[in-house]
């Protein structure tokens, strides 16, 4: 039987990790849900670069500050505020039928959210092999009577194969995202971001800092060979998707305002 992953800081959402095993979890099942309670009070979600075109239509895309910058989808402008999912983890932008089943959703849910509660992890620090693990505290996986099987005998079910493939693709997307950020840094295109919003009736603007964004002025001043490189690599439309998405910050602010969750004018770190 595979041993548990070695102790290390757990990623966002995860409370614990166990390797998925046909010996231990032979009778376990996955049950569907339209709720994501683990999202409650989370305002910044990791995003892969290839998701930028879809995500920019709905949410601001920023980068975390510091040398280890990562792209983040902003679900709120303040710690603990999520304007797209309610406290029960249900999407607020959906149309439901009389039974409460979602029949239409215009919202893009980032892959990082869809991946949970699964994760590819190294069971030993020096191992090169990644094993499919899961968070045992999740309420969607367990020894249920209902739901889809994880194993057929001692073999992974079609569902488990699909989960494994999704996680494999996510890891590859993560590597491409890290390379994208590195190239932005090599070109010195990331700068400290700041957004100032003057709300009606407020004596001071609401100022949000503590994140990074692409410096559009420097982008426009790139040398011909540098610009040609990011055009040929496919980076340029992704950069503009990020820049276009920043207009969504005001929409998120308006949503927070309607929810009564605007913190008084101050400096706020969203990342």
Task: Put a short name on every predicted segment.
Residues 1-76:
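Short, extreme N-terminal leader segments that mark the start of a protein/domain
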Residues 30-36, 44-47, 102-108, 163-170, ...:
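N-terminal start-of-chain detector that recognizes signal peptides
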Residues 53, 105, 211:
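Short, glycine/acidic-rich beta->alpha junctions
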Residues 54, 111-112, 188-190:
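Short solvent-exposed loop/turn micro-motifs enriched in small/polar/acidic residues
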Residues 64-66, 70-150:
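Aromatic- and glycine-enriched beta-alpha-beta binding-site module
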Residues 120-271:
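A contiguous, surface-oriented mixed alpha/beta subdomain in the mid-to-C-terminal portion of proteins
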